[in-house]
């Protein structure tokens, strides 16, 4: 799993042309430890509500940090990819920019995302969405932590192509 620690403190920046990037974090004042884990089946109750006939609705999870948006997203991906006795599994493409959905190790997902799921790990959402649309013929594209204008522009491109989106915001 992809465990992580958030750190707060005094930030120092270095200027690079017209932009700057953080160089150092000193005077550490806080830590937030998050233990990632799968909760298989947690999204089972949601799956019937995601369908419109055989198609999947565009679905976005909104909630405060730390309440399980990514956990529900991951389980929805697994359940939609797997299918069940009523519906065939769907081809799902995942853009996992921060390796929090699939937790890939050397390109292999360590979390169970289902048998029909393709993962682009460590790939910016905007680029990954377009790569999946062009090359993997997904029925659904899943992304975590949408927020930038270019992320939403790529999501709009998915909708225009007839591909369903699952995401967190």
PLM regions: where:
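Conserved nucleotide-binding/hydrolysis micro-motifs of P-loop NTPases
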Residues: 2, 11-13, 56, 98-101, ...
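Conserved catalytic network of the ASCE P-loop NTPase/AAA+ motor domain
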Residues: 52-54, 65, 82-87, 109-112, ...
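Conserved P-loop NTPase nucleotide-binding/switch module
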Residues: 136-169
């Amino acid at each position: 799993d992809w465990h992580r620690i958030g750190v707060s403190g005094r930030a120092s920046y270095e200027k690079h042309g017209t932009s700057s990037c953080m160089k150092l974090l000193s005077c550490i004042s806080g830590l937030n430890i998050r233990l990632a884990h799968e909760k298989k089946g947690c999204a089972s109750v949601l799956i019937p509500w995601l369908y419109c006939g055989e198609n999947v609705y565009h679905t976005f999870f909104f909630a405060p940090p730390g309440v399980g948006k990514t956990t529900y997203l991951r389980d929805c991906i697994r359940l939609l990819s797997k299918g069940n006795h009523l519906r065939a599994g769907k081809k799902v493409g995942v853009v996992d920019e921060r390796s929090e959905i699939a937790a890939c190790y050397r390109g292999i997902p360590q979390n169970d995302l289902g048998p029909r799921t393709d993962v682009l790990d460590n790939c910016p959402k905007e680029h990954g969405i377009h790569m999946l649309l062009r090359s993997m013929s997904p029925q659904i594209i899943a992304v975590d932590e949408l927020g930038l204008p270019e992320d939403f522009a790529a999501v709009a491109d998915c909708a225009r192509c007839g591909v369903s989106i699952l995401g967190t915001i």
